[in-house]
């Protein structure tokens, strides 16, 4: 194709920014409607987490394939196929009649969306000269930052005005517009050589991830290792990981070059980005059921609360314009401390909390996210170049998504387990034979001889037990952010 026929780079930048906005919006918009979905599809708390984790696992698995797919199909066709499949999966998610069907289409949506951000970034960088990359990436990043702000607010308003299906349907027109832009403004570029993919290692790692995620998602419901099913998933995860490690150490060109891990900063960067992933989306998944179930807030209010996180992230990314002036180790430490502080503040809530009690911790958590992303990336790739940089990028983003899916599952398990344990401890005290409940300042207007009064007390016990489960999950969130801090001291950095 001649140079005259190539679209203006500004149109390419606008298209790639829109595609990134679409994907980032989808990551947060759905979380607002999780309580509605749970009720409409008769899902349990652990099942509703699958709506999020299935998307993240599919994204983690498909992200490393981006380079290979782009070399095979071309950037234009890959972008068109991904956005088209994303649109179809979004529509199918809105039509889902069961939790299993919804989880399947969310996985398809995640798999289709996985290549969009790295592919769009590569297209933008290839469309502009190197001296303009800094300014261009800043504009491109607007899509990634704006999506998490707009997604929850718009999704919450639509879910309240209509129902949860509208949240998925709203993505379709955005996707169709992005689809048309991809076809008009994205052009293929010649690649120097075909990219070889280690399919054996990829399939082994995928099997290990699938086994691990299914074990975590199904464990609490099935009774953990007393269940043959959970033992089977654990065996699949262990066997897949073992075979992947053996294959990686013996293959001439493995899926993950083990020599990358000899680079100290990159290895530490992988641990840091894994923990970053653990902290990134967990509050977005845990909070909506708590806000609806404990406080009874509508979807629109939940959307604004989650949108606070996006605002905090925007501020954090804005501050990172000056990142080159600071030692990234200090910024990483500050980012994780802000995450820990946000988790601690959420763990201090009581059942009578107000919107402002949750709004500001979420904004603080978002600020921590914004402060962490750039310095962790700077540290991880400070000593990688060329082909090693491309390979390291794939592993880097994959581990971030795995961290998110694993921690969401663990947090959900903790909420369910501690709720059941707390309910078991509190419930036996609700009895007409409990003399403490007969005291006037305890009993209030309730008549312990009336079944309706006892039922009301039991409902409050269930509410209190559920609150304990959520508070414990936020304690764990805060502890996770603090545990990683000593690793920052091992990072080597020179200006």
Where are these regions (language model features)?
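Flexible interhelical linker loops that connect adjacent transmembrane helices
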Residues: 2-6, 131, 179-206, 221-225, ...
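Helix-loop-helix hairpins in multi-pass membrane proteins, especially solute transporters
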Residues: 32, 56, 63-201
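Hydrophobic transmembrane architecture of multi-pass small-molecule transporters
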Residues: 177, 395, 400-490
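MFS-fold secondary transporters
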Residues: 89-94, 109, 182, 276, ...
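Alpha-helical transmembrane segments
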Residues: 14, 84, 205-209
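Short helix-capping/hinge motifs at transmembrane helix termini and TM-loop junctions
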Residues: 97, 129, 185-188, 220-221, ...
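12-transmembrane solute porter fold
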Residues: 9-25, 30-32, 39-60, 67, ...
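C-terminal membrane-cytosol helix-exit motif in multi-pass small-molecule transporters
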Residues: 172-191, 208-218, 236-250, 487-492
């Amino acid at each position: 194709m001649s140079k005259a026929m190539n679209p203006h780079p500004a149109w390419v930048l606008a298209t790639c920014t829109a595609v990134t906005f679409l994907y980032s919006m989808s990551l947060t918009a759905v979380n607002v409607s999780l309580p509605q979905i749970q009720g409409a599809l008769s899902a349990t708390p652990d099942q509703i987490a699958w709506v999020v984790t299935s998307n993240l696992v599919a994204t983690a698995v498909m992200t490393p394939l981006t380079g290979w797919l782009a070399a095979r199909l071309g950037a234009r066709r890959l972008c068109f196929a991904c956005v088209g499949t994303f649109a179809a999966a979004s529509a199918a998610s809105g039509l889902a009649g069961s939790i299993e069907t919804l989880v399947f289409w969310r996985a398809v949506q995640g798999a289709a969306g996985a290549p969009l951000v790295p592919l769009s970034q590569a297209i933008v960088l290839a469309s502009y000269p190197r001296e303009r990359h800094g300014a261009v990436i800043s504009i491109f990043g607007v899509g990634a930052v704006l999506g998490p702000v707009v997604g929850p607010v718009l999704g919450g308003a639509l879910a309240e005005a209509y129902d949860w299906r509208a949240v998925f349907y709203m993505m379709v027109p955005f996707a169709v517009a992005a689809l048309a832009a991809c076809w008009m403004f994205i052009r293929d570029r010649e690649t120097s050589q075909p990219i070889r993919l280690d399919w054996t290692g990829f399939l082994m790692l995928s099997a290990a991830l699938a086994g691990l995620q299914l074990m975590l998602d199904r464990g609490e419901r099935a009774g953990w290792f007393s269940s043959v099913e959970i033992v089977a998933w654990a065996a699949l995860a262990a066997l897949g990981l073992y075979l992947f490690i053996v294959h990686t150490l013996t293959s001439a060109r493995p899926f993950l070059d083990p020599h990358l891990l000899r680079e100290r900063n990159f290895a530490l960067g992988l641990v840091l980005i894994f923990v970053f992933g653990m902290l990134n989306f967990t509050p977005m998944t845990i909070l909506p059921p708590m806000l609806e179930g404990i406080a009874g807030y509508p979807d629109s209010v939940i959307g604004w609360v989650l949108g606070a996180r996006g605002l905090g992230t925007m501020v954090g990314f804005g501050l990172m314009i000056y990142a080159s002036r600071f030692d990234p180790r200090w910024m990483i430490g500050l980012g994780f401390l802000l995450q820990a502080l946000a988790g601690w503040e959420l763990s201090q809530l009581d059942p009578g909390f107000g919107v402002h009690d949750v709004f500001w911790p979420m904004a603080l958590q978002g600020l921590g996210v914004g402060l962490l992303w750039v310095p962790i990336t700077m540290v991880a790739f400070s000593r990688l170049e060329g082909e090693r940089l491309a390979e390291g990028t794939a592993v880097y983003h994959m581990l971030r998504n795995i961290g998110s899916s694993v921690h969401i599952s663990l947090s959900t398990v903790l909420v369910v387990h501690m709720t059941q344990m707390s309910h078991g401890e509190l419930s036996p005290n609700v009895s007409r034979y409990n003399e403490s409940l007969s005291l006037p300042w305890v009993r209030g207007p309730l008549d312990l001889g009336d079944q309706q009064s006892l039922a009301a007390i039991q409902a409050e016990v269930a509410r209190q037990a559920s609150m304990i489960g959520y508070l414990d999950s936020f304690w764990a969130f805060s502890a996770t952010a603090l545990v990683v801090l000593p690793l920052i001291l091992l990072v080597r950095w020179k200006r």
